[in-house]
């Protein structure tokens, strides 16, 4: 399974909404500008996310999108499944050697476990350890 730009950009939309959760609606235009992405492409991606209940649209001059649930209730797996379909890195064939079949199943389950245990809250609050500021004492 290779995650396409649909999945990558969909995660970007959702992470940006999670970062601004509780602050009101966020426009796709601002997400597109912040991440240097095509607003038109993001509009195509937000429709299935809205239909799945992962985001809600707010109309009006100050409208935009908000998360459909709390950031800790939405997983990366939820988003990827909506945009990419079932999570299956390799098609498991019944007539394949048992050892290889077991390997493919273990790989599939490991990928699912990572995606299903990573919440939007985790992704939105992630900080790279190297970005920590130095503390100078006098």
Curated annotation (Swiss-Prot):
Transmembrane segments: none annotated. This is HTH-type transcriptional regulator CymR. It comes from Bacillus subtilis (strain 168). GO terms for biological process: protein heterooligomerization; regulation of DNA-templated transcription. Homodimer. Forms homotetramers at higher concentrations of protein. Forms CymR(2):CysK(2) or CymR(4):CysK(4) complexes in the absence of O-acetylserine. Residues 28-51 bind DNA. SUPFAM superfamilies: Winged helix' DNA-binding domain. Coiled coil: none annotated. One of its GO terms (molecular function) is identical protein binding. Disruption phenotype: Grows slowly with cystine as sole sulfur source. InterPro entries: TR_Rrf2-type_CS, Tscrpt_reg_Rrf2, WH-like_DNA-bd_sf, WH_DNA-bd_sf. Keywords: DNA-binding, Repressor, Transcription, Transcription regulation.
């Amino acid at each position: 399974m290779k995650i396409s730009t649909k999945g990558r950009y969909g995660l970007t939309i959702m992470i940006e909404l999670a970062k601004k959760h509780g602050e009101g609606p966020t426009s796709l235009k601002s997400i597109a500008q912040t991440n240097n992405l095509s607003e038109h492409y993001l509009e195509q991606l937000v429709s299935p996310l809205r239909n799945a209940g992962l985001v809600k649209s707010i109309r009006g001059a100050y409208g935009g999108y908000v998360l459909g649930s709390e950031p800790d209730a939405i997983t990366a797996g939820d988003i990827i499944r909506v945009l990419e379909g079932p999570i299956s890195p390799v098609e498991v064939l019944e007539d394949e050697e048992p050892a290889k079949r077991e390997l493919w199943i273990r790989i599939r389950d490991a990928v699912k476990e990572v995606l299903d245990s990573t919440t939007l809250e985790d992704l939105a609050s992630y900080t790279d350890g190297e970005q920590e500021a130095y503390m100078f004492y006098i």
